[in-house]
Amino acid sequence: MSAPFQLTSSDPSVIDPVGLAADTHEWIEAVVPGGVHETLIAAGIIAHPYVKDHEENCRWVEDRAWWYRGTVPIPVGDDPLVLTLTGVDTVADIWVNGHHVGHHASQYRPFQVTLPPIDANKAKVLIRFAPPLDGLAEPPATRAMVNAVSDFLNAAAPQNLDAEPGSGILTLDLAATRRRKGMFSWGWDFAPRIPSIGLTGPVELTRRSPIEVSHHVDTMAIGDGDSADVNVMVSTVHHDGPAPCTVDVTLTSPDGDRVSGHAQFKHGSATVDLQLDNPQLWWTHDLGKPSLYQVDIKICDKDANTIATDSGMAGIRTIEVDCSPDTDDPETDGPARHFTFILNGVPVFARGANLVPQSMLPGSVTPQQDHDLVRACRDANMTMVRVWGGGVYASDAFMTACDEYGILVWYDFMFACIDYPGDDEEFMSEVRTEADYQTRRLANHPSLALWAGGN
């Protein structure tokens, strides 16, 4: 369940509720999903930073600490309570009923924590967002790299033109490389400096399910178009302890044809092997129809009682990248290599565009806007888009639209064209957690064609 929130700000030196209570603050209604800028615009405190020189006039926003407060109803039940911040941008500390329950420092994954029992029917949630770069120092190795690039460019351009503000790595605040947040936030060649901050998604308080279920659908082989071998891998987490159980999986085609399978769990996982006759394959829109199957999963105990379910959509397709030598290449120092996407055994003419964030304020982008953007890509006859690594991961709505419209996605991990502090273990731990979350989130989208290391 979610609830309305209010917003106020403080000096960054105020770091806990005691310090906040000692100051005088005016609270305003918060725009959630959205962020601090959206809230201040709605309240008439700042003008939209896109207009005139208001980008400069609202620069103070990134130097303040921002606080959200709200009262969230507690759902009925006896299972443990789980607090989820579905969109966190970026550095946050969270209190529930006066108790600190967690710290978060990434724009690229949600915050979730299991709460201790609460003897009340509501939970008072307080969230402090620190200035995004507060307390961070620029990595020395990154500074050395940028200086070397700058020296090279200055030598190549005798007129010694100054780099434009927001022109990429030469004007970037290099401390930003230590923070898992879209690098475009601090200015790029297409973007002003407007680092977003705040709650970009709802705050939810739910009861944890005794059994958590996840699945992944993998097309193993397609036989001359008249059959397909599909593996459905199902994983469970039993919070009340392990118990013997089985899984039933059903795939339903767009025409309503069903194929089912059954398997026994072992160590929390099971794989159901299915063979589909005359499968309706997923294609890019220029090669065919992007057909999607309904996936229904049922977990049963030893007495055949249903104890958990899961569902989703899947596309039956194989995809690979042909990197074989190009024997027709005339280069004298050896042949070049192909880089061709092969979908269901057919080469794809990849044509499209790079996707940068639709807004400097990602929390204000709606699912409908994502859907309309993908439809426009299809109408422009694109077959592939690349999610650029200096921005943010694409939303579920965007990826679902790519599945439906038959658009492949080349996906960068969120790293821009700059060195990152790979020797910082705290940073690397955050990156590993992020990568695990994002790859699992996107794994079942048939539109996902490739993961790339970054920009």
State the predicted function of each range.
Residues 1-385, 393, 404:
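Secreted/periplasmic carbohydrate-active enzymes, especially glycoside hydrolases
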Residues 61, 417, 447:
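Helix-terminus loop motifs that line ligand-binding clefts
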Residues 384-429:
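Aromatic-lined substrate-binding rim segments of carbohydrate-active enzymes
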Residues 423-442:
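Ligand-binding grooves and catalytic loops that recognize ribose/phosphate and carbohydrate rings
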Residues 374, 399, 435-439:
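Generic structural signal for well-ordered alpha-helices
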Residues 437-455:
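Active-site groove signature of glycoside hydrolases
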Residues 129, 352, 389, 411-413, ...:
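A cross-domain feature marking catalytic cores of carbohydrate-active enzymes
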Residues 370, 395, 431, 435:
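Aromatic/hydrophobic pocket-lining residues that form the small-molecule binding cavity
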